[in-house]
């Protein structure tokens, strides 16, 4: 009976190396497809995998083919309608542009659909939040927030071919072959010495010489059957994510849920905050999030109530800022915490309250926070709140504001607010 042992390291995932190389090569096209696809998802389905489409012309590769010129004679099998020099009419109907797919139209009835493939949840989130970071993160006294970085960690017997260490694998191969054939080589050397003695002796010992030659051939065959490289020899460069401690941080999420915020506006605000939550939870460890909903009154809530509560009312934005100031003073010492805030609103506010918002931010919050972002979600003209905040933006480097008009603006605005900076703006 014959037994087959499958030692392939990637037996169940044989194309992993090709897949990783493909993702690296077409990262720009994939990220563009992801940024377009995220706007089509439901609020509760932001963090799953994705089907990515890439235009065919973007993945075309150089190839050798015959030129269009010259004279050629070809014989096609099964031809019983045409003879040499007959003209073949172009097929009628079904030409370019008559299909219903997403491929490009063609004048000769031929074309190619876009290349579509599936990426996993981890690949999707890695690309989604690539090159993003909390701005102005400062090393404080107490370290609880942990960011992970990849480091070399020796060698491992398992891995993907892209990480193979050729030198270490060949060293193991040499050691294995030496150990497995050392005894046979010593025996072979002894037989060869005996054969040399018998060959030069008188009278000739033909039978003994033939026996020695046969044994030598068998030993050499056994030595040659030892494989040059085996899966046991392979060693891969090992990488591991090590915690890179940094200062502890807290993110305040302030969302306007007043009556002026219609359902589509609230959905866009929720999409932004879900992206923010996924970014924080995937990139950092132990970062705290404080959720505040407000209309005429502000209330600190848990995650579920923040995203799903139906409570609504009038609009007094300063109530949320006052509550944030109270929470900071009560629980988050600025000397020990990196404090961040993201505020989303449609900009509609009681006119006399907007100057108060300016005052609270300028005197109480912006001096103690590392970064404060304001997102206004509206298609209308900006009102008093936006104009008051514009004065803050010109005064404070740690204050940023962006405008979202429709769903397609959410992801670009998010990346603009949290793109990785080369140097901290505030020490």
UniProtKB/Swiss-Prot annotation:
Coiled-coil positions: none
Keywords: Stress response
Claim: NADP is one of the keywords in the record: no
Naturally occurring in which organism (per UniProt): Escherichia coli (strain K12)
The protein's name in its UniProt record: UPF0229 protein YeaH
Compositional bias (Basic and acidic residues): 79-90
Keyword match Aminoacyl-tRNA synthetase: no
Family of the protein in this entry: Belongs to the UPF0229 family.
Domain of life the protein comes from: Bacteria
Record-linked InterPro entries: UPF0229
Induction of the gene: Expression is probably regulated by NtrC, which binds to the promoter region of the yeaGH operon during nitrogen starvation. Expressed in nitrogen-starved cells shortly after sensing nitrogen starvation. It appears to be continuously expressed for up to 24 hours into nitrogen starvation.
Stated role: May play a role in the adaptation to sustained nitrogen starvation.
Residue ranges, annotated region (Disordered): 79-110
Gly residues biased stretches: 92-102
């Amino acid at each position: 009976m014959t037994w087959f042992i499958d030692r392939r390291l990637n037996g169940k995932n044989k194309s992993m190396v090709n897949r990783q190389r493909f993702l690296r090569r077409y990262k720009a096209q994939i990220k563009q497809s992801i940024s377009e696809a995220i706007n089509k998802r439901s609020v509760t389905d932001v963090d799953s995998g994705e089907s990515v489409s890439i235009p065919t012309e973007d993945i075309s590769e150089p190839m050798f083919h015959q030129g269009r010129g010259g004279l050629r004679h070809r014989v096609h099998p099964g031809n019983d309608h045409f003879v040499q020099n007959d003209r073949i009419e172009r097929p009628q109907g079904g030409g370019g542009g008559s299909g219903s797919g997403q491929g490009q139209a063609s004048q000769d009835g031929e074309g190619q659909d876009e290349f579509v493939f599936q990426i996993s949840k981890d690949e999707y989130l890695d690309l989604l939040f690539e090159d993003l970071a909390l701005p102005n993160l400062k090393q404080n006294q107490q370290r609880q927030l942990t960011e992970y970085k990849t480091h070399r960690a020796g060698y491992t017997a398992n891995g993907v071919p892209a990480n193979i260490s050729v030198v270490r694998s060949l060293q193991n191969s040499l050691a294995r072959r030496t150990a497995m054939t050392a005894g046979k080589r010593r025996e072979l050397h002894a037989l060869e010495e005996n054969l040399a003695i018998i060959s030069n002796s008188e009278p000739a010992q033909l039978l003994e010489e033939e026996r020695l030659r046969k044994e030598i051939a068998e030993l050499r065959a056994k030595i040659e059957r030892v494989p040059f490289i085996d899966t046991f020899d392979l060693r891969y460069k090992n990488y591991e994510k090590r915690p890179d401690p940094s200062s502890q941080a807290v993110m305040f999420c302030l969302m306007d849920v007043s009556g002026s915020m219609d359902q589509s506006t609230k959905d866009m605000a929720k999409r932004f905050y879900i992206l923010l939550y996924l970014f924080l939870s995937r990139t950092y460890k132990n970062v705290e999030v404080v959720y505040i909903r407000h209309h005429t009154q502000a209330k600190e809530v848990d995650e579920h109530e923040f995203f799903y509560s139906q409570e609504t009312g009038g609009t007094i934005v300063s109530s949320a800022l006052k509550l944030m100031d109270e929470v900071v003073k009560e629980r988050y010492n600025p000397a020990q915490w990196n404090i961040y805030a993201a505020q989303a609103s449609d900009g509609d506010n009681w006119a006399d309250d907007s100057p108060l918002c300016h005052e609270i931010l300028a005197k109480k919050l912006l001096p103690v926070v590392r970064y404060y972002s304001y997102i206004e979600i509206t298609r209308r003209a900006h009102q008093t709140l936006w104009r008051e905040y514009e004065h803050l933006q010109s005064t404070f480097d740690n204050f940023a504001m962006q405008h979202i008009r429709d769903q397609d603006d959410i992801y670009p605005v998010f990346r603009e607010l949290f793109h990785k900076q080369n140097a901290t703006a505030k020490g």
